[in-house]
Swiss-Prot record:
Membrane spanning residue stretches: none
Location in the cell: Secreted
Residue numbers bearing the Methionine amide modification: M14
GO biological process: defense response; neuropeptide signaling pathway
Keywords assigned: Amidation, Amphibian defense peptide, Neuropeptide, Secreted
Source taxon at top rank: Eukaryota
Biological role: Tachykinins are active peptides which excite neurons, evoke behavioral responses, are potent vasodilators and secretagogues, and contract (directly or indirectly) many smooth muscles.
Keyword Ribosomal protein on entry: no
Protein known as: Ranamargarin
One GO location term (cellular component): extracellular region
Keyword Secreted applies: yes
Length: 14
């Protein structure tokens, strides 16, 4: 879902 994708992008930023 979008929320999961958003979290993944956030983690990828780290």
């Amino acid at each position: 879902d979008d929320a999961s994708d958003r979290a993944k992008k956030f983690y990828g930023l780290m």
